[in-house]
Amino acid sequence: MSANFKMNHKRDQQKSTNVVYQAHHVSRNKRGQVVGTRGGFRGCTVWLTGLSGAGKTTISFALEEYLVSHAIPCYSLDGDNVRHGLNKNLGFSAGDREENIRRIAEVARLFADAGLVCITSFISPFAKDRENARKIHESAGLPFFEIFVDAPLNICESRDVKGLYKRARAGEIKGFTGIDSDYEKPETPECVLKTNLSSVSDCVQQVVELLQEQNIVPHTTIKGIHELFVPENKVDQIRAEAETLPSLPITKLDLQWVQILSEGWATPLKGFMREKEYLQTLHFDTLLDGVVPRDGVINMSIPIVLPVSADDKARLEGCSKFALMYEGRRVALLQDPEFYEHRKEERCSRVWGTATAKHPHIKMVMESGDWLVGGDLQVLERIRWDDGLDQYRLTPLELKQKCKDMNADAVFAFQLRNPVHNGHALLMQDTRRRLLERGYKHPVLLLHPLGGWTKDDDVPLEWRMKQHAAVLEERVLDPKSTIVAIFPSPMLYAGPTEVQWHCRCRMIAGANFYIVGRDPAGMPHPETKKDLYEPTHGGKVLSMAPGLTSVEIIPFRVAAYNKIKKAMDFYDPARHEEFDFISGTRMRKLAREGEDPPDGFMAPKAWKVLTDYYRSLEKTN
């Protein structure tokens, strides 16, 4: 035992004679109600133990990332990190090692008592020290889970990027666990992770399932994305049944919502909203039905509903299920239908903040059926549009897999419904740079243009996709670290209300960073021509929105054309005279007239796509 430790320990003993433990005034239950966005006390310690190189730190940080992404407050205490601060006065003698683990156990207990899931990753080689850590928690009435991260010594040595095992075998490091100091394997751990046989994600899932069994992690966290497709082995049977059922004709807009629901973008919805879900969305911007308070808040800011006429309601009201038919083809079954009044003005006023029928989406609502029908969906097959772009329509599960295949450790999403200019690219490049500076190794950009219904004067999807391809071809964005995919949602032009929907869908698809621009999902008021929504409110609302805590919001820095640099640049008010703000209206006017924008505004090939589009309009007209 070191002399410093003995001196400090003796001094601590002398001070402790007149110290009285003070009880908290706030109970754990009350603390649990306000810690994180998922109410309920879930304080505990997950104690990872194993040889150096077994994978403790990797699993610890991956588990922390998983829990935080599901809005469960947690913190990871790493052995090396703690020895840089709290325990920097301790060495590696037997006494110092014992004190190292004791201190960590006490700190972990405080974290757990505060309502966090505390994850510790320490070799902690001796059984008596780990047992003492358990007793510290159990005496305080706090759960303690010992997780043995088990990997053979030769595997640990092969992973030794620091060269510690090599130095220990050379005699340069004395008392190194596994070489000349014993590691006492846990006899009855709560979980054993075989890291030489299982992937990191599999190991994390094992721990999550343990926490689920102990009611630390809610069941809803594990269920993941809800796709609504009929299982392959039952498609023929359900399709045959669909042919015998009454049918409801649906519009292209309705089919786009069927696609959204079936692919899991609206998880946990099981179909078009029934009245209870509709009212929750309309009045609270959240889904509460069937979710107990400890399972937290599910953000849902827009109603996903199926309008029907009074005649169709009268015809189908007594059915337990019926088929949805698009252009003569039965695409899905709707089960246990519930019909309720479509109060259009109220819906529009709450979603859009206005009910003017001159708004393009509100116009469609006002012209739709006077009734809504909700019910569970069984979708017979994946929705395909056969427009040459289906390969870009990746589902949330496919996007998650693609990010995994690219070894992404951060995914930042950019939602757009317009062509990409170099100002957009500057923001995406800057976001990537900042993520690399923060220590991420493989940040991936999800360039995710909206592919559902848009208003008539927006550039059509096929031309936008050509333009995005040209941007990548000219390497304005890095093709190797970019996923271009189509987000199948229709556009509502509902400003801050809609931008929450856009963000939560990307969150479901695995994004953990979301770039929000000026006036997202906004448009000019159809009557006054002023901004329908205050341009900065979208970003502000996203930063406060309930249920979106697993996504970090990246505000859109204002970019404009720098006349001196002849390039897009972040706007500096102190140099206002250097900048030219090229509006979308001006950009479209230049493209329509076949003129070139200033050098550096947009990649030349991408600009040519835009001018080709407007020329095609002239020919059509």
From Swiss-Prot:
Enzyme class: transferase
MF annotations from Gene Ontology: adenylylsulfate kinase activity; ATP binding; nucleotidyltransferase activity; sulfate adenylyltransferase (ATP) activity
Pathway listed: Sulfur metabolism; sulfate assimilation
Sulfate adenylyltransferase: region residues: 225-621
Coiled coil: none
Domain of life of the native organism: Eukaryota
Residues annotated as binding ATP 1: 53-58, 198
Pfam families per record: APS_kinase, ATP-sulfurylase, PUA_2
Record's keyword terms, sorted: ATP-binding, Disease variant, Kinase, Multifunctional enzyme, Nucleotide-binding, Nucleotidyltransferase, Transferase
Reaction it catalyzes: sulfate + ATP + H(+) = adenosine 5'-phosphosulfate + diphosphate; adenosine 5'-phosphosulfate + ATP = 3'-phosphoadenylyl sulfate + ADP + H(+)
GO cellular component: cytosol
Tissue: Expressed in liver, cartilage, skin and brain.
Disulfide bonds: none
Residues that coordinate or bind ATP 2: 415-418, 517-521, 559
Disorder this protein is connected to according to its UniProt record: Defects in Papss2 are the cause of brachymorphism (bm), a autosomal recessive disease, which is characterized by abnormal hepatic detoxification, bleeding times and postnatal growth, such as dome-shaped skull, short thick tail, and shortened but not widened limbs. The abnormal postnatal growth has been attributed to undersulfation of cartilage proteoglycans.
Free-text function comment from the UniProt entry: Bifunctional enzyme with both ATP sulfurylase and APS kinase activity, which mediates two steps in the sulfate activation pathway. The first step is the transfer of a sulfate group to ATP to yield adenosine 5'-phosphosulfate (APS), and the second step is the transfer of a phosphate group from ATP to APS yielding 3'-phosphoadenylylsulfate/PAPS, the activated sulfate donor used by sulfotransferases. In mammals, PAPS is the sole source of sulfate while APS appears to only be an intermediate in the sulfate-activation pathway. May have an important role in skeletogenesis during postnatal growth.
Family of the protein in this entry: In the N-terminal section; belongs to the APS kinase family.
Cross-referenced PANTHER family: BIFUNCTIONAL 3'-PHOSPHOADENOSINE 5'-PHOSPHOSULFATE SYNTHASE (PTHR11055), BIFUNCTIONAL 3'-PHOSPHOADENOSINE 5'-PHOSPHOSULFATE SYNTHASE 2 (PTHR11055:SF16)
Protein name per its UniProtKB record: Bifunctional 3'-phosphoadenosine 5'-phosphosulfate synthase 2
Species of the source: Mus musculus
Phylogenetic classification of the source organism: Eukaryota, Metazoa, Chordata, Craniata, Vertebrata
